[in-house]
UniProtKB/Swiss-Prot annotation:
Listed PANTHER family: DNA TOPOISOMERASE 3-ALPHA, PROKARYOTIC DNA TOPOISOMERASE
Function of the molecule: Releases the supercoiling and torsional tension of DNA, which is introduced during the DNA replication and transcription, by transiently cleaving and rejoining one strand of the DNA duplex. Introduces a single-strand break via transesterification at a target site in duplex DNA. The scissile phosphodiester is attacked by the catalytic tyrosine of the enzyme, resulting in the formation of a DNA-(5'-phosphotyrosyl)-enzyme intermediate and the expulsion of a 3'-OH DNA strand. The free DNA strand then undergoes passage around the unbroken strand, thus removing DNA supercoils.
Enzyme class: isomerase
Protein name: DNA topoisomerase 3
Organism for this UniProt entry: Staphylococcus epidermidis (strain ATCC 35984 / DSM 28319 / BCRC 17069 / CCUG 31568 / BM 3577 / RP62A)
HAMAP family with a match to the protein in the record: Topoisom_3_prok (MF_00953)
Pfam families on file: Topoisom_bac, Toprim
Active site: Y305
Ranges of residues in domain Toprim: 2-135
The protein's required cofactors: Mg(2+)
Length: 711
């Protein structure tokens, strides 16, 4: 009898097989004497679509809503049906005595495995592998500490409740809004509040009026002492009056006080912090950073589990620090690493905190030594960010003295603050500057003459627009960006980690760009006209993060076995009735700001111009029609002169390729150039790839709503 191991994806399945020395490879699984390892391909099973409950739901009709199934159904995803059949046959195999769930250790990973087991009708005992990295050592250690599957039943119930609630609310809200206003509109408990967060910041900036204010400083022996102000001076004349009073007067040093302080490095990375840092340094988008991290985690085995919300490590990891350091010897920081290897580390260090680690600890390097030449440029950059932060947190704190000098001139007090480094500590990793000392030694009671008096003009600044990095942080802390009437929800949002999860926020932002609710220009994220209308047309409950706070509060209770998941689902059904009825009874109108005078060749209605990832296309304004045609799109065809990608206008024989440098080619000229380049041997596949024929309506909510809507 053997144990069947169910991994989340093939790469992890292969890692487990390698760690357990399973060598007999078959189609969809790998076998050994004691174990068989198989895998999902992400989700193999998902929630059924509305039309799978009732074929009449294929047509979107307002009167059919809300669609509330008595019992939620699941279906096998058609494109992964072949792998599902393999997994099913292995689960039901008489020679398999138990199932070991080895999907990602978290709410969503639990859902991936349990939906498969439930669909198959598994009755065999379940065990759970719970690990944070997929190195050989971590896997082998994990198999020595397998947990009983029952210990994770509440986690599964919370995951299932979240999935079903998102389906019920998301499908109905999206269909209600779309059919009510005859427009492709999408709602969700995470995406709609995210639009609101951006809108609130945009309004703040638009309504901001800069104000001038003034400060005064005196110069004593080359050092500027600032006037201690009880208020902000908006009238320059007030400071000019003070200047007149203190001019040519003698001052006195009242106090010279030094205070020793220390600061630690910024915390170890969780996913959101790392995505922010990658955007700040390299302008890498959140999705790009996550994909790069996945490669470092799965393919190269260089970092621990990426989808974590923790900045800390558990106490039992203290013994793994040395071998992780030895791996980093392959980087340019080897001299610092050698110094650290000779030290001993304690679980009392600030980076260790069991209470602040739930599913996964912070992202840190594994014990695998990197082959730098095998990493892509992006992989190298992200790995180095993680390695640097890890090293900084193991190094000594930065020690410095804050020297404060208080002085008096007439009836006015002045202050000078100087930071004097004592020990660079972790700052030495990137900063080799020497300690700074004051060249003038101020003493208490010392009298001085003022060398210069200056009045400085300042202006208040508007807050900055969100970029992809800062928006992630705002989603993590929405209570800081939206006015919440009830302060208790601010606490809940802070405790639950905001709206969305570390794993889904990047997808949410990308989806909002694709559906044209948000746009980014020069790194500044703004709400489009469509986004503003979505907020105006949506029930207020869906524009506030309070709904997510309430959900998350209850989902966490379900995880702990303190709340009934079925009660939660019933509450979501009641909420959905309320939302749909509000939309149905609304008298507001939706205005297409991108309506053209081009008639739809299918139904005759005017078409809408929409932006896609690769260009622009025309889409029929009637969601039921679905007619679309390309206006222009970026291709992979390179200009023969400046080598930039060319844009395709039109189609067929009338198609024209244009470059920003002014070069133009017809379709026949492009075809000839392609043939000449490859001596006439151009496969259909290569041609397709070259001009990127894929046509897609990027802001279409239908496919998301009907397939695997993630709100």
């Amino acid at each position: 009898m053997k144990s069947l191991i169910l991994a989340e994806k093939p790469s992890v399945g292969r890692d487990i097989a390698n760690a357990l020395n399973l060598q007999q490879k078959s189609n969809g699984y790998i076998e050994g004497k004691q174990y068989i390892v198989t895998w999902a391909l992400g989700h193999l099973v998902t929630n059924a679509t509305p039309e799978q409950y009732n074929p009449s739901y294929k047509e979107w009709n307002l009167e059919d809503l809300p669609i509330i199934p008595k019992k939620m159904k699941t279906v096998v995803i058609s494109k992964t049906n072949r792998q599902f059949k393999i997994v099913k046959s292995l689960i039901l195999d008489k020679n398999v005595k138990e199932i070991i769930i080895a999907t990602d250790a978290g709410r969503e990973g639990e859902l991936v495995a349990r939906l498969i087991l439930d669909k198959v009708g598994n009755k065999k005992p379940i065990k759970r592998l719970w690990i944070s990295s997929v190195t050989k050592k971590a896997i082998q250690e994990g198999f020595k500490q397998l947990k009983n599957g029952n210990a994770y039943q509440n986690l599964y119930e919370a995951a299932l409740a979240r999935s079903e609630a998102d389906w019920i609310v998301g499908i109905n809200a999206t269909r209600a809004l779309t059919t009510k206003y005859d427009a492709q509109l999408s709602l969700g408990r995470v995406q709609t509040p995210t639009i609101q967060i951006v809108k609130s910041r945009q309004d703040e900036i638009n309504y901001f009026k800069p104000e001038k204010y003034y400060t005064l400083s005196i110069n004593v022996d080359g050092y500027d002492l600032n006037l201690k102000q009880q208020k902000r001076y908006k009238d320059k004349k007030e400071l000019e009056l003070i200047e007149h009073k203190i001019k040519h007067q003698e001052g006195k040093i009242l106090e010279v006080k030094g205070k020793n302080k220390k600061s630690y490095a910024q915390p170890l990375f969780n996913l959101t912090d790392l995505q922010q840092e990658a955007y700040k340094h390299y302008k890498m988008g959140p999705k790009e950073t996550l994909n790069t991290l996945q490669h470092l985690y799965e393919r190269h085995k260089l970092v621990t589990y990426p989808r974590t919300d923790s900045n800390y490590l558990t106490d039992d990891m203290v013994d793994t620090i040395q071998e992780r350091l030895r791996a980093i010897l392959a980087t340019d920081y080897k001299s610092h690493v050698r110094d650290l290897i000779s030290e001993s580390f304690s679980s009392k260090m600030h980076i260790f905190n069991n209470q602040k680690v739930s599913d996964h600890h912070a992202i840190i390097p594994t014990e695998v030594r990197p082959s730098i030449e095998q990493l892509s440029q992006r992989e190298f950059k992200i790995y180095m960010l993680i390695a640097e932060r890890f090293l900084e947190n193991l190094m000594n704190p930065y020690l410095y003295e804050v020297l404060t000098i208080h002085a008096q001139l007439k009836d006015y007090n002045f202050v000078l603050k100087e930071i004097i480094p004592k020990q660079l500590g972790y700052k030495a990793l990137k900063d080799q500057t020497s300690s700074h000392t004051l060249t003038h030694s101020f003493k208490e009671g010392q009298l001085f003459k003022v060398h210069r008096i200056e009045i400085h003009e300042h202006e208040t600044k508007a807050p900055e627009y969100f970029n992809e990095g800062s928006l992630l942080k705002a989603m993590e802390n929405p209570q800081n960006h939206i006015d919440l009437n009830d302060k208790k929800y601010a606490k809940t949002l802070k405790h639950s980690g905001g709206i969305g999860t570390v794993a889904t926020r990047a997808d949410i932002i990308e989806k909002l760009f694709n559906m044209n609710a948000l746009e980014s220009r020069d790194g500044k994220i703004k709400v489009t006209s469509k986004g503003k209308q979505i907020l105006e047309l949506s029930p207020s409950e869906l524009t506030s993060p309070i709904l997510t706070a309430q959900w998350e509060e209850k989902l966490m209770l379900i995880e702990k076995g303190k709340y009934n998941s079925q009660k939660f689902i019933q509450e979501m059904k009641n909420f959905t009735f309320k939302v749909v009825n509000k939309i149905k009874s609304s008298e507001q109108k939706y205005k297409h700001d991108n309506l053209t005078t081009t008639e739809c060749p299918t139904c005759g209605k005017f078409m809408i111009k929409v932006k896609t990832k690769n260009g622009q296309m025309l889409v029929c304004q009637d969601p039921k029609c679905k007619t679309k045609k390309n206006i222009q799109r970026k291709t992979n065809a390179r200009c023969p002169y400046c080598k930039k990608k060319m844009t395709l206008f039109g189609k067929g024989k009338e198609a024209v390729y244009r470059c920003v440098c002014g070069h133009t080619e017809t379709q026949s000229q492009m075809d000839k150039r392609m043939r000449d380049k490859t001596n006439g041997k151009v496969s259909r596949k290569e041609m397709k790839k070259y001009i990127n024929k894929k046509e897609e309506i990027d802001n279409n909510p239908f496919k998301d709503a009907l397939k695997n809507l993630k709100l």
